[in-house]
Amino acid sequence: MISSPSTPATFAAGSLVLLCLVLGGGHFALAQKEGNDDIQHYTADDCQVTPVIHVLQYPGCVPKPIPSFACVGRCASYIQVSGSKIWQMERSCMCCQESGEREASVSLFCPKAKNGEKKFKKVSTKAPLECMCRPCTGIEDANVIPQELAAFADDGTLTSYFQKGQLRNSE
């Protein structure tokens, strides 16, 4: 189930739901769980344009701090067993990313400029115009480690079922 950024996702209490941590700009964010025992709502979308100081650097020039913007926040992500095909997983990994960009030109002072070169270097920089939760880079199925290999599996009903199924196939 994928929800729009303004609508919280809703999962039945019996659903297997694992939330992935989103790393963005050095911040870790995990969705907050709200609701009663029957229905759980995960509301985590909080992706905003944030003012930052960006230091522009160019070889031979004096670094120049300038006011800029960055996308900072958290977005809801999950992995769950498919409702229609219980042998498959449904994933939704969302990341706080730019939606449009602005460009600016800045002059840097370059005291080590050689003869004939200008003492000021004009450089271009970009910053996000707006930010929103968008799908992260796709995950290759080959990169997903099964729970049994990652040592996270418990002795639940499904784990026992799959182990028995593997034994029957190997006989």
Curated annotation (Swiss-Prot):
PROSITE patterns named among the record's database cross-references: CTCK_2
One GO MF term: hormone activity
Signal peptide start-end: 1-31
Domain CTCK: 47-137
Key words of the record: Disulfide bond, Hormone, Secreted, Signal
GO cellular component terms listed in the entry, alphabetical order: extracellular region; extracellular space
Disulphides: C47-C96, C61-C110, C71-C131, C75-C133, C93-C136
Subcellular location: Secreted
Swiss-Prot/TrEMBL GO biological process terms: animal organ morphogenesis; chitin-based cuticle sclerotization; cuticle pigmentation; sequestering of BMP from receptor via BMP binding
Predominant cellular place of this UniProt entry's protein: secreted
Further remarks about this protein from its record: The bursicon gene is encoded by two loci: burs124 contains exons 1, 2 and 4, and burs3 contains exon 3. Exon 3 is trans-spliced into position in the mature transcript. This unusual gene arrangement has existed for at least the 150 million years (MY) of mosquito evolution since the split of the culicid and anophelid family lineages, but is younger than the 250 MY split of the dipteran suborders Nematocera and Brachycera (containing the Culicidea and Drosophilidae, respectively).
Self-association and partners: Heterodimer of burs and pburs.
The protein's role, per its UniProt record: Final heterodimeric neurohormone released at the end of the molting cycle, involved in the sclerotization (tanning) of the insect cuticle, melanization and wing spreading.
Protein name as annotated: Bursicon
Organism field: Culex pipiens pipiens
